Amino acid sequence: MVLSSNWSKLSKTQEKRVKKAEHGKSDGKSDGKTAGVGSRASGTPPETAQRRKSKAKTSKIMEMVAKMNREMANSRQNSAEKNEVQKGALEEKISVDMAQSGKAGKVGSVGKFVAMDCEFVGVGPDGKESVLARVSVVNYYGQEVLDLYVRPKEKVTDWRTWVSGITPAHMKQAVTLEEAQRRVAAMLKNRVLIGHGLHHDLEMLMVSHPKAQIRDTSMHGPFREKYGAGKTPSLKKLAREVLNIDIQGKEHSSVEDARAALLLYKSDKVEFERLHQQRFSRRKA
């Protein structure tokens, strides 16, 4: 192991301090009176045990703070790297899907199918009430066709950046809720809407969509039975179990979540449509 120059300097400095301390002890033993007079004459009082204890405590605290800062920096770096890996895995799945569809490298039209997801921030006391802050829509091939940051009417008390990925800086390019509603409604008109937990997203958008044109991965029977024990499985769990990819490592992205929901639908499209047709044919009867 090769020691750094800083470490070498520190070692030498420590050796000098030890020798100086030993020399001071030797002087004190040989002539205690002289040492005491010298200290008082110089105007520097002898260091008390309490003072030494205080210095040691301060030093220990500083070491702990430095260690915590290093760990936090490493955690942020690891999280950022993990998010990039996850994003790359999802994009690769989308690329493969497009290649199999013969759409690789092409920017297609919106088409009949779209997938949507939203992100929210907190307002009110402690930021517990959710309001819309971003809405993203992708086409059947995972291409982004709409991505809007939405300016909340209320004062944001919790940006939830750690999960939403949204910061105050994003509001510089944000649109009003009314504009977002208008553009999303136009995008969804006469199209099949895919997503995960769409009831909540549509409710927060205050936009309606015909149930016959909704494909919600959170409500898909086979997914609920196999991965949720009859309950609603999370998008994160379905992505891991069905698509073999990890998403939402830390900060969420509505574009990525919309793409994940789209791939989940396409992974079991035949069964999705069979069950959907069965459900709505009963209603008509």
UniProtKB/Swiss-Prot annotation:
Q: Where is the composition biased (Basic and acidic residues)?
A: 12-32
Look up keyword Acetylation and say if it applies. Answer: no
Name where it's found: Nucleus
Give the GO terms filed under biological process for this record.
Answer: RNA processing; rRNA processing
Biased-composition ranges, Polar residues, are: 1-11
Which species is listed as the source? Eremothecium gossypii (strain ATCC 10895 / CBS 109.51 / FGSC 9923 / NRRL Y-1056) (Yeast)
Q: Name one GO cellular component term.
A: nucleus
Looking up InterPro entries in the UniProt record yields: Exonuclease_RNaseT/DNA_pol3, REX4_DEDDh_dom, REXO1/3/4-like, RNaseH-like_sf, RNaseH_sf
Name the PANTHER family for this protein.
RNA EXONUCLEASE 4, RNA EXONUCLEASE REXO1 / RECO3 FAMILY MEMBER-RELATED
Name of the featured protein: RNA exonuclease 4
Q: What is its main location?
A: nucleus
Record domain Exonuclease: where? 113-265
Q: Which UniProt keywords apply?
A: Exonuclease, Hydrolase, Nuclease, Nucleus, rRNA processing
Question: Where does the source fall among the domains of life?
Answer: Eukaryota
Which Gene3D superfamilies does the entry link to?
Ribonuclease H-like superfamily/Ribonuclease H
Q: Enzyme class, one word?
A: hydrolase
Q: Does the keyword Manganese apply?
A: no
The ranges of region (Disordered) come to 1-59
From the Swiss-Prot or TrEMBL record, what is one GO molecular function term?
nucleic acid binding
Q: What is its EC number?
A: 3.1.-.-
The family database entries (Pfam families) matched by this protein are listed as: RNase_T
Q: What does this protein do?
A: Exoribonuclease involved in ribosome biosynthesis. Involved in the processing of ITS1, the internal transcribed spacer localized between the 18S and 5.8S rRNAs.
Q: Name the CDD domains for this protein.
A: REX4_like
The record's similarity note reads:
Belongs to the REXO4 family.
